[in-house]
Design a protein with these regions (language model features):
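Sec-dependent signal peptide recognition
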Residues: 2-8
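Bacterial Sec-dependent signal peptides at the C-terminal "C-region" and cleavage site
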Residues: 8, 12-21
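Ser/Thr-glycine-rich phosphate-binding loops at phosphate-binding pockets of nucleotides
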Residues: 180, 184-185
């Protein structure tokens, strides 16, 4: 069984619950939780994945500043940033690398639905998810989002940019995030863990951990969808937009293997990493 290292010396590293009025950074974790191979692991306090920082507490912002955090990388689109602007972390450079995999839930809602439920507010968004679970376009997005993130050339270019920022950073911690810290951020973590030498089991475990964070909401809104007559196809939309669909993610990893031979070849192909790049990342972030 895969072993995991847990560093819980500071509350920020623990999962935050998904609530109507969240306080704190949701779905945040330090990648040092994972053993890579042969007792190697990622340096603690260097690489963080998370949801947006709009609801970060003062203590969390102070913690990130004192690490220190060198870069905050935001994968969100302009409208997402405008609705929930990140709190500022003193001393950190803010870098926007927008990734659009057509997974924006609000894009699947009609103007009438958006108006009825108050625009882009986070809690109201979940009400809209229940409504659009029966929408064929939303079902298509739910099925294809990971494929787009891995195989769309624009997405690949943005993940290549993400790696260039990592490689160019000599000191300090890096935090990267999207809105919920699950799809765009989850794929970024998968690629980063692969570059650092993590095995497939670890990559999948990190991706799937998001479902533990959002489990209560997934169950709640899945029940609502079933109440209105929804079947597995409709429930799959809720799971994909609120949590992650790990089976679909694994399917795309297999597609990478089929098309490129391995995820390492994929990193050296469309993502553009060289052997020197990978060695730089491993020397910087991996320790015994």
């Amino acid at each position: 069984m895969k072993q995991f290292l847990l560093f819980l010396s500071f509350p920020i590293l623990m999962f935050c619950s998904c609530t109507k009025d969240p306080k704190g950074i949701v779905n945040m974790r330090d990648l040092s939780n994972y053993i890579i191979a042969d007792s190697l692991h990622i340096r603690q306090g260097m690489l963080f994945r998370a949801a947006h920082l709009a609801d970060a507490t003062d203590d969390e912002i102070q913690y990130l500043a004192t690490l220190p955090t060198t870069k905050i990388i935001d994968f969100r689109l302009e409208d997402e940033k405008r609705d929930r602007a990140d709190r500022v972390v003193h001393g950190a450079e803010y870098i926007n690398i927008p990734i659009d995999a057509s997974g924006n839930v609000m894009a699947q809602a009609t103007d009438e639905e958006k108006k009825k439920f108050g625009g882009n507010k986070r809690f109201d968004l979940r009400k809209i998810i229940v409504m659009i679970a029966f929408n064929d376009k939303a079902k298509k997005v739910a099925r294809e989002i990971y494929h787009n993130l891995f195989f769309n050339s624009d997405c690949q270019a943005q993940y290549a940019h993400f790696f260039r920022e990592l490689i160019a950073t000599d000191t300090g911690a890096i935090l990267y995030h999207c809105t919920q810290g699950k799809d765009r951020t989850g794929v970024a973590s998968a690629l980063l863990l692969a570059a650092l030498g993590a095995d497939r089991e670890t990559i999948i475990a990190d991706f799937d951990a998001t479902n533990a964070v959002y489990e209560a909401d997934i169950r709640k809104y899945s029940r609502r969808v079933r109440f209105f007559g929804g079947k597995e196809d409709e429930v799959a939309v809720v799971k994909a937009f609120i949590g992650v669909n790990t089976d679909n993610f694994i399917r795309e990893l297999k597609q990478i293997d089929e098309q490129y031979g391995s995820i390492e070849n994929y990193l050296k192909g469309p993502i553009g990493l060289t052997d020197d790049d990978i060695n730089t990342l491993r020397k910087r972030y991996i320790i015994k």
